[in-house]
C-alpha cells in the first residue's frame, strides 16, 4: 500500500479561503447603489442634482441641453412610464438617439436602439444608469476573417486545385 502524505496544514491561500467561506441559506442580493444613492433616491432626485453625480463626459452632454429628437424620446419615456405605473406592459420605445444619457426614470423600460441597420432590443437595468444608450447597441461587427482563398498568396498560385 502506498504511503499517504500527511496534511501539514499548509495549503494554498485559495483553499483556505474556500474553507473559511460559509454559506448559510440563499445568497441575498445586495441593494443597488449608484455613487452612494439607492434607486429610489435617484428616481426622486431632480435632474440638476443627478447631473452632478454622473461622470464628466455624460455631464457635459447633459449640460448642452436636449435636441428635438431627444425631447421626443423624453415624451415617449414619460408616456411609457405612465403605462408601467398603471400596471400595463409598455411597448418597446424605438429610438435613433444613441447619445442620450440613461437616467433613473428609464430603468425597467424596453428600448429598441438603432445600430445603423436594425433596432437592438434592450431592457435597461440599474447598472446602466449614467451610460449612453449607444453603448448597448454596437454599431460595428467584429470581423472574423476566414482562411485565404486560392490565389490569395503567391505560394498558393501554383498549387494544383484538387
From Swiss-Prot:
Q: Keyword rRNA-binding on this protein?
A: yes
Q: Which GO terms describe its biological process?
A: ribosomal small subunit assembly; translation
Disordered: region residues? 1-29
* Entry keywords, A to Z: Ribonucleoprotein, Ribosomal protein, RNA-binding, rRNA-binding
What NCBIfam families does this protein's entry cite?
PRK04038.1, uS19_arch
Q: Where is the composition biased (Basic residues)?
A: 1-27
Which molecular function term from Gene Ontology is one that the record holds? structural constituent of ribosome
Q: Which GO terms describe its cellular component?
A: cytosolic small ribosomal subunit
Name the record gives this protein: Small ribosomal subunit protein uS19
Write out the similarity annotation.
Belongs to the universal ribosomal protein uS19 family.
What is the name of the gene encoding this protein? rps19
Q: What does this protein do?
A: Protein S19 forms a complex with S13 that binds strongly to the 16S ribosomal RNA.
Amino acid at each position: 500500500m502506498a504511503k499517504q502524505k500527511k496534511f501539514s496544514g499548509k495549503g494554498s491561500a485559495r483553499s483556505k479561503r474556500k474553507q473559511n467561506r460559509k454559506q448559510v441559506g440563499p445568497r441575498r442580493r445586495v441593494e443597488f447603489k449608484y455613487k452612494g444613492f439607492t434607486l429610489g433616491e435617484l428616481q426622486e432626485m431632480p435632474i440638476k442634482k443627478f447631473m452632478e453625480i454622473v461622470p464628466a463626459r455624460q455631464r457635459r452632454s447633459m449640460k448642452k441641453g436636449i435636441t428635438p429628437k431627444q425631447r421626443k424620446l423624453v415624451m415617449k419615456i414619460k408616456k411609457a412610464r405612465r403605462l408601467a405605473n398603471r400596471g400595463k406592459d409598455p411597448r418597446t420605445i424605438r429610438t435613433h438617439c444613441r447619445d442620450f444619457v440613461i437616467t433613473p426614470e428609464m430603468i425597467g423600460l424596453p428600448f429598441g436602439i438603432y445600430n445603423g441597420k436594425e433596432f437592438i432590443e434592450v431592457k435597461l437595468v440599474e447598472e446602466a444608469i449614467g451610460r449612453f444608450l449607444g453603448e448597448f447597441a454596437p454599431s460595428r461587427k467584429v470581423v472574423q476573417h476566414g482562411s485565404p482563398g486560392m490565389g490569395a498568396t503567391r505560394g498558393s498560385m501554383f498549387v494544383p486545385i484538387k
